Every structure is written in structure tokens, then in C-alpha cells.
């Protein structure tokens, strides 16, 4: 069960602290996987798919027939929503495209700057029991807008050896060039060094678990990466007027990503705190990834009670007021203000 705390009784380091201890052998495991993929290529990827995902893979690359089947069986309303989301994302990222320029400072002196897109980008998309079409759209479309000529996507297959059709539909909608059935650290290694089937890319983007993050860190330098993504985290600021079911759902939207995720609620209502605590116990068993959400909530989850909404809660390096002024928050990755929240 998620733990309740009184803000006055907590030290700042206790608010920030979370148990992110990983398996001690992560580094060694990832080193071994990278070495195997470099040495044996596709053969190693197929063995890891069977070992980690229970999937027997004959052909690593997703065929056009598989993509066509995914579209044929997809709900038309979902496809329309997918296309609308893709259009919105593309519209936003077109505003970020850098402009080339030339300056003629003096006769005979010409200065300028030209932006050239990388040739190949690799996009990692998590798989397993969860499907993240949003990850596909938000990682692939910026590359497409930038003019990247080849976008290679990797994602683990299910036990049936097939990629989630939602992911395939999103990938085709976004403009992925090639899709491969491989995940985890082995997929990162394949994108960095190449295999018989998978081309080596110039940059790898996309989130993943601690093995994926560790692999990205280790191949950085051979290939560019977007960032080392830590475990998911969410801070919900809610008063007594909020719906506890919605608050609990928001917390679980991140808790179900990773057992190391940190779902945190800050409220000035003891009644809401208790209600959310109870609601979490109702909702967690209903989740497909209930075991992961349970580990996250029980280990790293917090409900912090404050006396008045003007109290400041220290989160990472930001001073975030419950009556939040978005312009004063410097480190939040994403701010969502509404009820219910659109988070995931």
C-alpha cells in the first residue's frame, strides 16, 4: 500500500529519495549482451528473443503483410485518432526546424550555417504487455520532419512472434522505414553496431527499462543518443475537490511503466489522501501490469500531506507550489493542468 507522510515530518532528502537500486549484475549482463550481438548478430538477437520474451523469431524484420494485416484489423476510430495525433505532433515539430542562414559581413567574407539531417535514426519502442503508440509517434515524427532518410524501429515481439498491431499501425502512420522484432539491450546493441539484418544507425532515441538505458549509455560515442531516461515519475498536486479515482489513475499511469517508477501525490486533504490510498488498492489488481504497478506504488510511492496549499514541496531541484505557476518551474518534463488529467 502507498505510504502516507506529513510534510512537516519529512526532510528534503526523504521527499526526493526513492529506491532505485537495480540488480547488481545489470552492467555485466548488458556488457555480455552487447558483446554477443556484436559477435553473432541476428543469431544472438533471436536467442535473446526466445530467452527474454518467449518469442521464436524466424525473420527479424516485420513484413509489409504484417503491417497491412494490422491496419485491416484496427478499429477505424482508433486509426482516425492516430492520424489526428500524428498531424498535431508534426505541426508542432515543424516549428522547431532550424533555418539555414548566410551572412555577408564584408566584401569577400561570407559566413553561414547549414543544418543537415542525419542519415539513419534508430527508434526503440518498449513492448511486452503494454503498447505505446504515443512513443512511436513522438520519436519517429520529429526525425521525419527533420529529414532523416532512414528511420529504423526496434520493438520486442510477443510470445506469438508478432509485434503488437497497435505499434505497427503507429509506425506506419508515422513513417518508419523498417521495423525489427527485437527489444532490450540487444536491440540497442544492434542499432549501434549493426547486424546482418539491422543497419547501424547514427542516433538512437526512445525510452526503455534499466537494461535499455544502460545499453544506451554504453554505446554512446559509437552512436548518438537522445538521453539516459531514468525511471518514470509523476507528481500529482490535488486538493480535496479532486476525484480520488482520477488521481489514483494518474498515479498508476506512470507506476505501471516500471517497478522503479515514483508516483507521488501532494495534497492538503487528509480525506482525499485516504480515498486515493483506497482507490489504488481497487485499481491496481485490474491492471495488465499489476505486479509492476504494485512494486512501484509500495516501494517508491508517496502521499504527502501538507497543511496549506502555499507550502512548497521540493521535487528534484524545483520549488513547486501546489498553486502552481508553470512559468516558475524549471525542471518539469511535462506539465498537465486539468481534471481529469490527459496523462497517458
Regions found by a protein language model. Name each.
Residues 52-53, 209-211, 240-242, 255, ...:
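Glycine-rich beta-alpha junction loops
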Residues 1-119:
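N-terminal Rossmann-like NAD(P)+-binding subdomain of aldehyde/semialdehyde dehydrogenases
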Residues 337-344:
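Conserved small/polar residues in nucleotide/adenosyl-binding loops
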Residues 104-169:
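Conserved small-residue-rich beta-alpha loop and adjacent elements
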Residues 4-7, 179-183, 303-307:
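Short acidic-hydrophobic, aromatic-tinged amphipathic segments that line or gate anion-handling sites
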Residues 263-310, 319, 326, 332, ...:
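NAD(P)-dependent aldehyde/semialdehyde dehydrogenase
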Residues 175-262:
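Conserved NAD(P)+-binding/catalytic subdomain of aldehyde/semialdehyde dehydrogenases
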Amino acid at each position: 500500500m502507498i505510504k502516507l507522510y506529513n510534510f512537516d515530518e519529512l526532510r528534503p532528502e526523504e521527499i526526493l529519495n526513492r529506491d532505485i537500486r537495480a540488480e547488481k549484475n545489470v552492467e555485466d549482463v548488458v556488457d555480455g549482451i552487447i558483446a554477443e550481438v556484436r559477435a553473432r548478430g541476428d543469431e544472438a538477437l533471436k536467442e535473446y528473443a526466445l530467452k527474454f520474451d518467449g518469442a521464436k523469431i524466424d525473420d527479424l524484420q516485420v513484413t509489409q503483410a504484417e503491417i497491412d494485416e494490422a491496419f485491416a484489423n484496427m478499429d477505424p476510430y482508433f486509426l482516425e485518432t492516430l492520424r489526428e495525433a500524428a498531424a498535431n505532433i508534426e505541426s508542432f515539430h515543424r516549428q522547431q526546424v532550424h533555418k539555414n542562414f548566410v551572412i555577408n559581413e564584408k566584401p569577400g567574407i561570407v559566413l553561414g550555417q547549414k543544418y543537415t539531417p542525419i542519415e539513419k535514426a534508430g527508434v526503440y519502442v518498449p513492448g511486452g504487455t503494454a503498447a505505446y503508440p504515443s512513443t512511436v509517434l513522438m520519436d519517429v515524427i520529429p526525425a521525419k520532419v527533420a529529414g532523416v532518410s532512414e528511420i529504423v524501429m526496434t520493438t520486442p515481439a510477443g510470445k506469438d512472434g508478432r509485434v503488437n498491431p497497435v505499434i505497427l499501425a503507429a509506425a506506419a502512420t508515422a513513417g518508419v522505414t523498417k521495423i525489427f522484432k527485437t527489444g532490450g539491450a540487444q536491440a540497442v546493441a544492434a542499432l549501434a553496431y549493426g547486424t546482418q539484418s539491422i543497419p547501424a544507425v547514427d542516433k538512437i532515441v526512445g525510452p526503455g527499462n534499466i537494461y535499455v538505458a544502460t545499453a544506451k549509455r554504453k554505446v554512446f560515442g559509437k552512436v548518438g543518443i537522445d538521453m539516459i531516461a531514468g525511471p518514470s515519475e509523476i507528481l500529482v498536486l490535488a486538493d480535496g475537490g479532486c476525484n480520488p479515482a482520477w488521481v489514483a489513475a494518474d498515479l498508476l499511469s506512470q507506476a505501471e511503466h516500471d517497478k522503479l517508477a515514483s508516483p507521488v501525490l501532494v495534497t492538503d486533504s487528509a480525506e482525499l489522501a485516504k480515498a486515493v490510498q483506497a482507490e489504488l488498492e481497487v485499481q491496481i489488481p485490474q491492471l495488465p501490469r499489476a505486479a509492476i504497478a504494485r512494486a512501484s506504488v509500495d516501494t517508491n510511492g508517496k502521499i504527502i500531506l501538507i497543511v496549506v496549499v502555499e507550502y512548497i514541496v521540493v521535487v528534484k531541484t524545483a520549488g513547486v507550489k501546489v498553486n502552481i505557476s508553470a512559468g516558475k518551474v524549471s525542471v518539469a518534463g511535462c506539465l498537465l493542468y486539468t481534471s481529469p488529467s490527459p496523462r497517458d
